[in-house]
Structures are given as C-alpha cells and as structure tokens.
A protein has these predicted regions:
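Left-handed beta-helix
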Residues: 1-7, 200, 204-399
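Unchanged
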Residues: 1-257, 364, 382, 387-388, ...
Length: 399
C-alpha cells in the first residue's frame, strides 16, 4: 500500500480578542484548559494519536508563551531527527509585509515552505477547540471522495447561536454552500475549523485570490470559491465539539468537564491529552476545605469552599473563601472571606479578603487579567473585566 504523505498545519496565531483581558499579552491557543492543559494541546494530541508524524504550528500573535509551552514538540513525541515538529513564525518577505490578515492569508504566506514539503494531503486545523477526532479518518474520506477540499462539520444543538461560525449546507457527502458568520443562519451545521486539502487545488485558489488582492479568513473567499467548483466534501463529526472563543463559552466549556458524564475527556486512556507541564508538588486539601465537583491541579492548596470549579496549578484558596462555577488559572490566590462566582481569574492574580466577584446565575462571567490585585472588600458585578497589569508595571513593582 502506498503511504500517504500528509502534513498537518495547526493554526495557532489567533489573538482571541473576544476573550478580552484573558488574551491580552498571549495567543488564544496558549490559554489554560482543564487546569493542567492548554488549548493547543488538543489539536497536537489529536495529530499524535492519529499517527501524523509531520506537524507544523503556525504562530503570529504573542508567540513567546506559546513557543515555550510547545517545547520543540517533545510532549507529543514529535521531536524527530527527520520530519516531525516545526514552528512557522511570522515573517516579512519581498511579497508580504506586516502580519497575516486571516487563516487563508497565513497559508499563502507560508506556501513556499508547505509546497517544498510536497504533501499528498494538507490537513489544517485550528488550535482553540475541544474536539476528539482521528485525523486519519478525515484524510481517508478526503482521498476516497477525490475532493479538492474536505470540511469537517458538526450539527450544533438547537438554540445555539451559529452566527459566528461557518454555516455549511451539505447533502450526499458534498458541501453545496457555505456562509461565513451569517447574520441570519439557515441551519445548525457548522464547520469545525478542520480541513483537508488537495495541495494543488488549494495553491491555485490561493494564487488567484492573492492576485485579486484579498484572502482574509478561509470562510470569506477561499472556501466559497472551492465550493463553487463543486469538489468540496463534507465529513460529518458526530462527537463533541466546543468552540471556546467567547468568555461564556470558555468558562462553560470547561465546567462541562466536571460533569459525571462529561462530553469531552481530557484523561481518556485510549486518547489522552498530552501536554508540557513543569513538575510541581501534589495538591493539598486542608481540614477546613469543602469540595464538590472540583478539579485540582498540582500544587493547589485549598482550605476554603470549591464548588463546580477548576483550580489551576499553585492556586491558594484560604479558609473561609468561596469559589463557585469558576476557573482559576495558575498561582491565583483567593484570600479569606472572598467570594468568587462565575468568574475566570488569570494567573498570578490575588483576590483580596471579603471581595465579591460575579454572581452564581449570571450569564456573563467576570474576567480578571493576569497579575491583578483585587482590593479587600471590592465588589465586581457580573460581566466586569479587569485588564492585566502591564509589563512595565510589573518591572516597576507598581499596582
């Protein structure tokens, strides 16, 4: 049997501006998820378990934290002598200035190096979703369909606002039309931002669009042109898929992991999520602690009450403090008597004594950026956002 030469490109350069202070100073794929992991781990673990040996990560916005986490691909067994892991960093050249304006633009900027790899199939996926998917199934279906492109789609639950997605109309295994972020969606089937391409067909469309002066995101012009050619296949994903691109989705998507029958497992023995994580000591639960549906990462120290929440590495929750329906990132401190509800607190922040954040039944969570100090007795109502301390403030030691 002829071996298929497949290349997986993980798009990890997104800013994630809808997440407000949580992505100030870092790319969205570097955000923590489930306490121990980062969003990019999901895509890389899918690639590793799918036996894809050549995986490239395309970076752009704030790449430093993400680059450190990627550790040369070692946590995903991609640090190979031949092939394996590669980071595609942003660059300027004779044909391109500034940064890429979208996913399709990012592909055309990096096309020379992709083309030199000469893949039979180019699999492109985003790095900011919860998804378990064997990419080998996608590649096999793509080749069987002799398609120029294959869109991995899923049907969203009734009542979901799909206006921020690529809405897909398909039948008989073929995509008939796509509508990118429509104001009035006509269905609930959306693209999961996983695609397989025939490289020659993709290159032709990218060249034409680049010559015409506009690429942007894949759904704006690239996919509509491919669909118009009639050779785009639909691969229906029936499992769990969760976009974590808004504050509410980022919080609720993680709290779903705490259910007894969670729709997504980070610790599935057959498909574990792999990550790069420094060695830290075990979590400590003090005598005064009360826990109900709590995920505790290493080195957490809990003496207060935790309900339906994810507690990141090194987090300290003092006696008398309450944390409910929230996500606390690395090394957050919640002082005695403080109450945190429906909130996402970024790493290194300190919640002062008797401070009150959020409300248990609020739709919009409180967002606190990294290394902030919330004063004692402060009140932050639902939907409040605090930007991180700026780097120069950290250097000066100001508050």
């Amino acid at each position: 049997m002829t071996r298929v030469r497949a290349l997986c490109v993980v798009l990890a350069g997104g800013r994630g501006s809808r997440l407000g202070p949580l992505t100030t100073g870092r790319a969205k794929p570097s955000l923590p998820v489930g306490g121990n992991y980062r969003l990019v781990d999901i895509a890389l673990s899918n690639a590793t378990h799918s036996a894809l040996t050549d995986v490239w990560v395309l970076q752009q916005y704030e790449p430093h934290l993400l680059g450190e986490h990627l550790a040369g691909g070692r946590p995903w067994d991609l640090d190979r002598t031949r092939g394996g892991f590669r980071i595609l960093a942003p660059f300027q050249g004779p044909e391109h200035d500034g940064f890429a304006s979208g996913n399709a633009d990012a592909l055309v900027r990096n096309w020379p190096v992709i083309d030199s790899f000469d893949p039979d199939v180019l699999l492109v996926c985003s790095a900011d979703h919860l998804l378990t998917l064997d990419f080998r199934d996608v590649i096999a279906a793509h080749l069987d369909a002799a398609a120029d492109a294959t869109v991995v789609s899923t049907v969203m639950p009734a009542g979901t606002d799909v206006s921020r997605y690529l809405v897909v109309q398909a039948d008989g295994g073929r995509v008939r039309s796509v509508d990118y972020k429509p104001e009035s969606p006509t269905g609930r089937c959306v693209g999961t931002e996983v695609f397989a391409y025939r490289p020659a067909a993709l290159a032709e469309q990218l060249r034409d669009l680049h010559r015409d002066g506009g690429l942007g995101d894949y759904g704006e012009r690239l996919l509509p042109r491919l669909v118009a050619g009639g050779a785009v296949a639909d691969f229906r994903h029936d499992g769990h898929w969760r976009d974590l691109g808004t504050p509410t989705a980022y919080l609720d998507g993680q709290l779903e992991l705490l259910r007894e029958r969670s729709p997504f497992r980070l610790d599935d023995p057959a498909w574990p999520i792999l990550t790069s994580m420094p060695v830290r000591g075990p979590a400590i639960v003090r005598r005064t602690a009360s826990l109900d549906r709590a995920a505790l990462a290493p080195a957490a120290d809990v003496a207060g009450e935790v309900v339906n929440s994810i507690v990141g590495p090194g987090v300290v929750i003092e006696r008398g403090a309450q944390v409910r329906h929230s996500v606390l990132m690395d090394d957050v401190v919640v002082r005695a008597g403080a109450s945190v509800a429906r909130s996402v607190i970024a790493e290194g922040s300190v919640i002062g004594r008797r401070a009150m954040l959020g409300a248990p039944n609020a739709v919009h969570p409180v967002l606190v950026g990294s290394h902030r100090r919330v004063a004692a007795d402060a009140i932050l109502p639902a939907g409040s956002e605090l930007e991180p301390r700026r780097p120069r403030d950290l250097i000066r030691g100001t508050r």
